[in-house]
Amino acid sequence: MSTLEIKTLHAQVVPADENEDPKPILHGVNLTINSGETHAIMGPNGSGKSTLSYAIAGHPRYEITEGEVLLDGENLLDMEVDERARAGLFLAMQYPTEVPGVSMANFLRSSATAVRGEAPKIREWVKEARGAMEELAIDPSFSERSINEGFSGGEKKRHEILQLGLLKPKFAILDETDSGLDVDALRIVSEGINRYQAVSYTHLTLPTT
């Protein structure tokens, strides 16, 4: 059984202007997530939902000033961002970043290699990736496109759920994953999340408004 423990977490937003002071957002957050649990964190805009997500993941604009985040007893705050991912943490952002010049195919296989510790065999990987894309109604041609470049909101979200299914993290933090989705896209994304959780027992934290 895996456990994610957030203990007395304080965090602040680091301003882009170095002449401005950091803005404290989180004040002593405590949360424990055990295997098989789904948690929904609800609150108005500006209440700190995204701050909690990004701070745990290690975003440089969000500085943790006090507390611990333990994944199976290991303090994530002592790890670099890539080490947190390899430890089993996954973040789906509200506004996924576009990465021109890097194809989805290369990104996904490189990410899987980093997380799994070895490169998946080409034939097996192609079968695995195509199957996951089919389940999310992603056109195979998208694998040759640059990451999120020119994607619709629904396509970006499906790409993130595709990553979730292929990387198989211990814990997934989904930041307002329903934002900007129409009814059909929301259904596909929701089914993808439910399907993955049923198979792998991933434990989801869902910041939402």
Where are these regions (language model features)?
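Conserved structural motif at the start of ABC-family nucleotide-binding domains
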Residues: L4, L26-G28
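The feature captures the beta-strand-to-loop junction immediately N-terminal to the Walker
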Residues: M42-P44
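ABC ATPase NBD Q-loop/coupling interface
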Residues: E68-R84, N148
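ABC-family P-loop ATPase nucleotide-binding domains
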Residues: T97-K170
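Walker B catalytic motif
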Residues: E176-T177, D184
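Helical segment within the ABC ATPase nucleotide-binding domain
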Residues: L186-V199
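Conserved small/polar residues in nucleotide/adenosyl-binding loops
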Residues: T202-T208
